[in-house]
Design a protein with these regions (language model features):
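Membrane-anchoring alpha-helices and their flanking helix-loop junctions
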Residues: 1-103, 108-161
Length: 161
C-alpha cells in the first residue's frame, strides 16, 4: 500500500502544482524554460504512475474489503465510464459543443471515471486510488473555473520579453 500512496503523492502532487502554486509554476517556467519544466514534470508523473500501478497491483493481492457494492452499481459504473470516455474525447476535439459548454471536459471525465470505480468497488485499494483521483479532479475543476473567471488562459504560458 505504501507504493500506491507514494505514487499517488507524486503523480497527483505534480498535477496539483497548477492548483496550489500557479504563480510559482509560472516563475519556474520563466526561469528554467518550458522544455526543462515539461521534462521534470513528465519524469515525476511517470515515476508516480509506475508506483501507482505497482502499488495497486500489490494491494489487490491482499484486499481489505470496506463495503460490498450492490449489483446495480456495476451498471451505473459502466454508464459513468462511458460518459468519462466521451468527455475525455471532447477535450481533444477542437471547437466542440461539449468543451464550449463544460470548459474542462477532461477533468470532468476524470471525475466521472473515478466516481464510477468508487461506486463499483469497495476495497481499500480502490477507494484510495479512485477517491484520490476524484478529490484531485474536484479541486482541479474548481481551480480551473476560478482561472477561467479571472481570464487566465490554460496551457499557454509564454514569458514576457
Amino acid at each position: 500500500m505504501a507504493y500506491l500512496i507514494l505514487g499517488l503523492v507524486l503523480f497527483l502532487g505534480v498535477h496539483s502544482v497548477r492548483i496550489v502554486a500557479d504563480d510559482w509554476r509560472g516563475r519556474t517556467i520563466t526561469r528554467i524554460g518550458a522544455m526543462p519544466w515539461k521534462g521534470a514534470y513528465a519524469i515525476v508523473s511517470l515515476l508516480g504512475l509506475v508506483l501507482i500501478v505497482w502499488g495497486f497491483s500489490q494491494a489487490r493481492m491482499t484486499p481489505t474489503q470496506i463495503w460490498s457494492p450492490p449489483m446495480g452499481m456495476r451498471h451505473l459504473a459502466w454508464l459513468l465510464t462511458w460518459l468519462a470516455f466521451v468527455l475525455l474525447a471532447a477535450a481533444y476535439v477542437p471547437g466542440n459543443a461539449i468543451k464550449a459548454r463544460l470548459h474542462h471536459p477532461m477533468v470532468l471525465g476524470v471525475k466521472s471515471w473515478a466516481l464510477a470505480h468508487l461506486l463499483a468497488n469497495g476495497n481499500l485499494a480502490h477507494m484510495l486510488l479512485f477517491g484520490s483521483f476524484l478529490l484531485w479532479a474536484a479541486f482541479n475543476f474548481s481551480a480551473a473555473r476560478r482561472r477561467d473567471r479571472a481570464g487566465v488562459r490554460l496551457h499557454r504560458h509564454r514569458p514576457q520579453p
